[in-house]
Amino acid sequence: MFTRGAPGSLVGTTLHWGAWFNDGGGFGVALVLAFGLVLLISVSLSGLAARTVLSTALMFLAAGALIGQGGFGLVDIAPTGPLVTGLADIALFTVLFTDGQRASLPALREGWRLSGRALGLAMPLTMAGIALPAHFLAGLDWPTALLLGAILSPTDPVFASAIVGRDDVPLRLRRLLNVESGLNDGLALPFVLIFLATAKGQESDLGKVGVELALGLAFGIAIPALVALAWRLKILTAEPRLQALGPLAIAIALFATCHLTHANPYLAAFIAGSTLATLDRTAAHHFEPLGDLLSELTKFGALLVFGALITPERISHLSLGDWAVAVLAILLIRPATMLLSLLRTPLPKRERSAAAWFGPKGFASVVYGLLALQAGIPAGEHVFDLVAVTIALSIVLHSSTDVPVAKALRVEPPDNLPTGARKNDDREPA
């Protein structure tokens, strides 16, 4: 449920996260144990995953499905319960704040020629392209179909890590995919909220959404800007080992401020990350390793819970038209719109094809789907189910094809990838 307003209200579009550990009738400990075990396995196999089709993201999704009611029934999680909504709320805020720090004004200017096309042309075309089959094949009305298009328009490079996470992949391709995925989460949010209010048929909600977005924008600029300017005073110096905690403190204060004032925390998070990276690149640089780890942890936790929500009962009622929407969104609509946006660009054909294919539906879509489910719109369950199967299909396809595509691009694995072999540099030869 939403933290403010009546049930189903859009007033305060954040997600309730209190007492989530006890959600699901005492299954919290089992869920945490499962997360720890899968995290240990995925870290231990991360070197192998970097070289093969093995996907750590897919591990968490599959593990969630196994422990959920569609598997062994070890956990029973409600999609609208505080566990799901709280974890999604914190995780998306963390991811957007971290992604925003990769989108400083200098970085945007440097890569804007390509990423601007992806965001300004491919993204709106993807929204509209998904809305068409959602209306004609899945039977959604136009506002709800456009809502689905907005929910599924963001991308997530975590499911294509062999492409965006390797230094030997062409920089312009990595930058294009990183900037696109870093910005489209935040850019999709206003469209999601507007179409959500329209689908509810309550025009008065549009004004409230506008106020929330405006407050989020204001806090996202003001709070990190004031802190960054204060840090320029000679008396305010941090020990090197603590410098990563400065941006984290900004994020925590911003998160609490947004929840207290009804500002939209997701837009605020992304804008704050970008503002901090623009005004204090050193602070953003020190925070990057910590931010990446926090983002990965929260994403993996959300994927585990999301996998537990995907049960046979939830997907068995989907029609052939519903499945067609998911398949078309991944195999046709995203690739076609991206290729169209990259026409007459300096990218070689192989890199354009890779950029077109790697538009995985990821974490932001999970949270936006939950927003639709909790908002009380007539087709909320239908929208969430469509989002769920599309994301699951995307994770399977994209996270298992990133390494083969990298090899097709003739990109050799870098020498510093972990192999499991022990170094003998300090030993005497036998």
Set out the residue ranges of the language-model regions:
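Transmembrane helical cores of multi-pass secondary ion antiporters/exchangers
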Residues: 2-430
